[in-house]
């Protein structure tokens, strides 16, 4: 029998062509064999979130927020870039998962039995309760029993809808509410303080942050107990992303990174003071504009708004302030400190601010390098208040009591112990008013949060006013001015009149405001 002569070159070419044709349909090519592999092949972790002071926000174009920072670190952990998509409300977030437009939802979402039926939860990292809010001065409900849809509105996709339904079925049959499909919880809280809405429901942490800028928002009652907060991902047979999240959070917890991030965003305390916050925000409007140039001039290693918060805590922005112990001026410097800094007049605002910054920089330079960069300021401020030697004692005490002396979250818990004899008697530098240093730093952080949020709100309002003006008075060509389609001369005369009389300018008036008055 004659042997068949095989043309290996022909077979090789044929096999290559067939492989090229079928390659995209092969499972390990057309798509990665698991979700983590797909993310790494794409080189991008897609995270959807909402814009709030806690989850994700931007200042001067730089993103920040608890969920953003954690998501960025998780992307780094996977070795990919982070892509953030901001949605308006929770319902839109879950649409992103359903439509395959997101790998993760990182937006302070609450774990509950309904959500986990359709979505995969990740590890929990803090907890919140759902609370009913109202405007100070308005009627405060003590129960949900008589609330109607005309009074209570909640955001779409809000976890509390399930809780409300349960309460309606079990306790309050007359309870009713409305869901606003176009607004998130933050916008609904704004509607409450503007008098457009009687009540809404939001989580306790979001409310606490909102009150720093809008102290007129008040909590009427708790709707739920504490609920864990988590991230969500698609629910299917692929658990690789869930496993990676678990490993990531375990690592963050073990090395203390998670505690430091939570301290940064959640460690400001929840002891909200309505009068103090309102007084501070009034001072922001009345006093800060004159001092802002000085804060901006001398703030070097820190943000000027933090410097302003420090000065307010020291003197309430009073250059003539004097304490019973003899400290004076905007930054409340002692006579000896002022002399060492070359300050000739402690009541001169510029000299005081300049000296205070230099003294704070000296404290910053003494903080050990082992302390994380973004926490060094809190150690320095505590030292600024009670003396650097006592800060050394606080760190030593933290280490002795099995805490981390480089973690502000751990050290601040030990500060009040510096005034208790069983502890200070065993320390190198003895008694110190550690509880005052603790309150000092916490107050500064609260003022900083209020100031940053309030200035952002002002900027937002100015932008909206400018956009409204552009809509009310659109640009027209010179040839159109003579056709009386645009009241140009009237606009100029009214603007000039308003400027000269210092009355509210048209630049910040809505179209038709005069019509409403008539």
Curated annotation (Swiss-Prot):
InterPro entries associated with the record: Lysozyme-like_dom_sf, MltF, Solute-binding_3/MltF_N, Transglyc_AS, Transglycosylase_SLT_dom_1
Region (Non-LT domain): 22-269
Pfam families documented for this protein: SBP_bac_3 (PF00497), SLT (PF01464)
Alphabetically ordered keywords of this record: Cell outer membrane, Cell wall biogenesis/degradation, Lyase, Membrane, Signal
Superkingdom of origin: Bacteria
Keyword Lyase: yes
Keyword Lyase: yes
Signal sequence extent: 1-21
This protein's GO CC annotations: cell outer membrane
Residues the record marks as active site: 314
Catalytic activity of the protein: Exolytic cleavage of the (1->4)-beta-glycosidic linkage between N-acetylmuramic acid (MurNAc) and N-acetylglucosamine (GlcNAc) residues in peptidoglycan, from either the reducing or the non-reducing ends of the peptidoglycan chains, with concomitant formation of a 1,6-anhydrobond in the MurNAc residue
E.C. no: 4.2.2.n1
Region feature (LT domain): 270-518
Enzyme class: lyase
Mode of membrane association: Peripheral membrane protein
Principal localisation: membrane
Localization per Swiss-Prot or TrEMBL: Cell outer membrane
SMART domains in the record: PBPb
GO terms for biological process, alphabetical: cell wall macromolecule catabolic process; cell wall organization; peptidoglycan catabolic process
Gene Ontology terms, MF aspect: peptidoglycan lytic transglycosylase activity
Function of the protein: Murein-degrading enzyme that degrades murein glycan strands and insoluble, high-molecular weight murein sacculi, with the concomitant formation of a 1,6-anhydromuramoyl product. Lytic transglycosylases (LTs) play an integral role in the metabolism of the peptidoglycan (PG) sacculus. Their lytic action creates space within the PG sacculus to allow for its expansion as well as for the insertion of various structures such as secretion systems and flagella.
Annotated domain remarks: The N-terminal domain does not have lytic activity and probably modulates enzymatic activity. The C-terminal domain is the catalytic active domain.
Similarity section: In the N-terminal section; belongs to the bacterial solute-binding protein 3 family.
Protein name: Membrane-bound lytic murein transglycosylase F
């Amino acid at each position: 029998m004659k042997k068949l002569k095989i043309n290996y070159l022909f077979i090789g070419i044929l096999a290559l062509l067939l492989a090229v044709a079928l390659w995209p349909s092969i499972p390990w090519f057309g798509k990665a064999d698991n979700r983590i592999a797909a993310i790494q092949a794409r080189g991008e972790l897609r995270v959807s979130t909402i814009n709030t002071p806690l989850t994700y926000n931007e200042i001067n174009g730089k993103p920040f927020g608890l969920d953003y920072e954690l998501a960025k670190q998780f992307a780094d952990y996977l070795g990919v870039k982070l892509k953030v998509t901001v949605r308006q409300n929770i319902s839109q977030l879950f649409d992103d998962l359903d439509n395959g437009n997101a790998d993760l939802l990182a937006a302070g979402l609450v774990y509950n039995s309904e959500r986990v039926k359709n979505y995969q939860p990740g590890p929990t990292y803090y907890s919140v309760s759902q609370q009913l809010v109202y405007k100070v001065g308005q009627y405060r409900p003590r129960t949900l029993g008589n609330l109607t849809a005309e009074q209570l509105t909640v955001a779409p996709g809000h976890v509390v809808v399930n809780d409300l339904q349960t309460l309606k079925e079990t306790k309050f049959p007359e309870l009713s509410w409305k869901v606003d499909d176009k607004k998130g919880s933050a916008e609904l809280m704004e509607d409450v303080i503007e008098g457009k809405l009687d009540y809404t429901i939001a989580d306790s942490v979001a409310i606490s942050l909102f009150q720093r800028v809008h102290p007129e928002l008040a909590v009427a009652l708790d709707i739920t107990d504490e609920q864990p907060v988590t991230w969500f991902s698609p629910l299917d047979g692929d658990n690789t992303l869930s496993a990676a999240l678990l490993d990531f959070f375990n690592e963050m917890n073990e090395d203390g990174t998670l505690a430091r991030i939570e301290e940064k965003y959640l460690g400001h305390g929840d002891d909200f003071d309505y009068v103090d916050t309102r007084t501070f925000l009034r001072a922001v409007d009345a006093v800060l504009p004159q001092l802002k140039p000085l804060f901006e001039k001398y703030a070097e290693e820190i943000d000027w708004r933090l410097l302003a918060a420090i000065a307010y805590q020291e003197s309430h922005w009073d250059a003539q302030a004097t304490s019973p112990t003899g400290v004076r001026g905007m930054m409340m410097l002692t006579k000896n400190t002022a002399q060492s800094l070359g300050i000739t007049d402690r009541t001169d605002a510029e000299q005081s601010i300049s000296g205070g910054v230099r003294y704070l920089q000296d404290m910053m330079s003494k903080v050990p390098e082992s302390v994380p960069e973004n926490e060094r300021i809190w150690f320095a401020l505590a030292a600024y208040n009670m003396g650097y030697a006592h800060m050394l004692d606080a760190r030593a005490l933290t280490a002795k009591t099995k805490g981390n002396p480089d973690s502000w979250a751990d050290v601040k818990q030990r500060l009040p112990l510096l005034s208790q004899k069983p502890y200070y008697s065993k320390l190198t530098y003895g008694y110190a008013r550690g509880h005052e240093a603790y309150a000092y730093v916490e107050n500064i952080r609260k003022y900083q949060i209020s100031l940053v949020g309030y200035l952002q709100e002002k900027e937002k309002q100015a932008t909206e006013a400018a956009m409204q003006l552009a809509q009310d008075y659109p640009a027209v060509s010179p040839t159109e001015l003579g056709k009386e389609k645009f009241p140009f001369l009237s606009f100029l005369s009214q603007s000039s009149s308003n400027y000269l009389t210092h009355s509210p300018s048209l630049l910040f008036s809505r179209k038709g405001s005069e019509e409403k008055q008539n």
